[in-house]
Amino acid sequence: MTKPAVSYCLLSCIFALLVVSFASADKDDQDKQEYIVYMGALPARVDYMPMSHHTSILQDVTGESSIEDRLVRNYKRSFNGFAARLTKSEREILASMDEVVSVFPNKKLKLQTTTSWNFMGLKESKRTKRNTIIESDTIIGVIDSGIYPESDSFSGKGFGPPPKKWKGVCKGGKNFTWNNKLIGARYYTPKLEGFPESARDYMGHGSHTASTAAGNAVKHVSFYGLGNGTARGGVPAARIAVYKVCDPGVDGCTTDGILAAFDDAIADKVDIITISIGGDNSSPFEEDPIAIGAFHAMAKGILIVNSAGNSGPEPSTVASIAPWMFTVAASNTNRAFVTKVVLGNGKTVGRSVNSFDLNGKKYPLVYGKSASSSCGAASAGFCSPGCLDSKRVKGKIVLCDSPQNPDEAQAMGAIASIVRSHRTDVASIFSFPVSVLLEDDYNTVLSYMNSTKNPKAAVLKSETIFNQRAPVVASYFSRGPNTIIPDILKPDITAPGSEIVAAYSPDAPPSISDTRRVKYSVDTGTSMSCPHVAGVAAYLKSFHPRWSPSMIQSAIMTTAWPMNASTSPFNELAEFAYGAGHVDPITAIHPGLVYEANKSDHIAFLCGLNYTAKNLRLISGDSSSCTKEQTKSLPRNLNYPSMTAQVSAAKPFKVIFRRTVTNVGRPNATYKAKVVGSKLKVKVVPAVLSLKSLYEKKSFTVTASGAGPKAENLVSAQLIWSDGVHFVRSPIVVYATN
């Protein structure tokens, strides 16, 4: 009679152990997180097999013979590494290995024209210099949300075969067609329900940026009549290769996909990469996927143009901070879209892109605070979801204290909305009539409403106005100083980013809750300014195909239009807002002198940041090591087109910058140094440079001294080298923080 009891007890114990085992397995699985394992450059050995090596490492670390559910992605064409699902302890083991540079989480990053090119002087005219043969051999890689291949902006009509150097493919997925303009397409987004595996653009963002950089010239383009004109890229004859890393279903752009896109784009032999993507915060280079990809691209002669981000106007918000990336801020152009609100007692001017025409008819006005029976005054004033009473807003124009929730007013039956914002240089698109007002104008509307029993207003269709003051830096983009490398100025340059009309994807709505579909749309952000600079860089490369990425970047920076802190309320951070100034494509063709920094210069720069010999060898892929002199070298002495130093607040300072210029102007040239700006005492030695031949190099030092800026302040000057024909301008910035 005891045997059944023993058996029952034994079974119970086994069952309990299985439960614990499964629970433990579930916990282990839940504890796994996707990480990027960065291993530097690909070894030069002919017998090296990256995928086999990655598999072997994972098997050793995890103790599992089958790693199919662990390995996410390999990087094997342009640099070395992989993405994998790891526990915290496995991550730590990998990070300690001699062959590994860094291990960091697979994070999600964010996506960050008919008149802008004319505004910059690069006009559609026979007088505009173009080298179309070389331009047609230029390939711009676009790492973004894909592309709408049927757009006229990407038509292959009139194009010959792809350049012979092209090593890429077109893997665009189902119903995706390539041509001799759109020569390559790849996608790295995960398979999600409702979003086919394809390089097709379901966000509109990638089509917009690609056409801004290199779209064909397409006439009679507008957004419902706004911004009517010819939409074109900076280099219409150039080819486009698309690398899709963002999808609406992913809610961002994954780190592993971005690195895979760089891995392929470099090996595919693109000339320039534009990537309007970034994080909210800056990261060390070895944990920043864009900085990692950009370093290996730079080493192969490819310029990376990256958006500064849209987290401004607060200081220290720029996330694109590596010196081997060209970081772009945003400005306006001389064109603006204005949505007028006509009140019973006058007019006020708002700012948005309103394509809806209410024929000037006036409708009753109601304030969100007065249109709620379920929320407090603050939430109702913001028109927060669930607060508005449809009976109180239906058929009326609703005032909302925030631009975040006009869709809520529409959902409750409002005819239009007037919203308050502290930024009117962001012309957003809405799915019904909306006008955006600054505080003073918004208060004018409120005062009018309080002065009459039956307030009414009309929200008019947007008008296009020209000749506004421009270029002025935008409010929204991220500012310096550089929080990782304080002595490198970021952003580098400013370009048009506000209210840009460019190609769009009919597979995506132009705004949230929008049922309309368009082929061209208006968008705003450093995402839009970034491809402008990529287009300018490609334009320069068509005249100077052998120039290195740093030479092209230097030419653009040192010939930029000067900007200053007095032209806009958002310019108060001066060079930390606009960098070297506003891009000037035509002048950049002939810069006279350039500051060049190649791979070895950047390795020396990393030596000064105390990178280990092991990591330097892995990153460089060669036997690079640091000399004692390089170890002591200051980051400010990288041969960069701008000069920046962080000093102690309110204390006398003296800083020295060492630079070398290369003559790309004319032989037998003599350049004299001139310093503009009285807030710094600057000495240049030598103050005269005589260059007998092209590509001759000359070195000099710049010593800046002074009493010391207050905390959170900067002082600046401009160094200008000139031979009477060329004016090579570099900002000198000295600042103090807390």
From Swiss-Prot:
Keywords (alphabetical) are:
Autocatalytic cleavage, Glycoprotein, Hydrolase, Protease, Secreted, Serine protease, Signal, Zymogen
Which EC class is this protein assigned?
hydrolase
Question: By its UniProt entry, which Gene3D superfamilies does this protein fall under?
Answer: 2.60.40.2310, 3.50.30.30, Peptidase S8 propeptide/proteinase inhibitor I9 (3.30.70.80), Peptidase S8/S53 domain (3.40.50.200)
Q: Propeptide ranges, please?
A: 26-112
Processing and modification events after translation: The C-terminal propeptide is autocleaved.
The main location is: secreted
Q: In what residue span(s) does the PA domain sit?
A: 362-433
According to its record, what are the GO cellular component terms? extracellular region
Task: Write out the GO biological process terms.
Answer: proteolysis
Query: What PANTHER family does the entry give?
Result: PROPROTEIN CONVERTASE SUBTILISIN/KEXIN
Similarity comment: Belongs to the peptidase S8 family.
Q: What is the name listed in the Swiss-Prot or TrEMBL entry for this protein? A: Subtilisin-like protease SBT4.5
Species per Swiss-Prot/TrEMBL record: Arabidopsis thaliana (Mouse-ear cress)
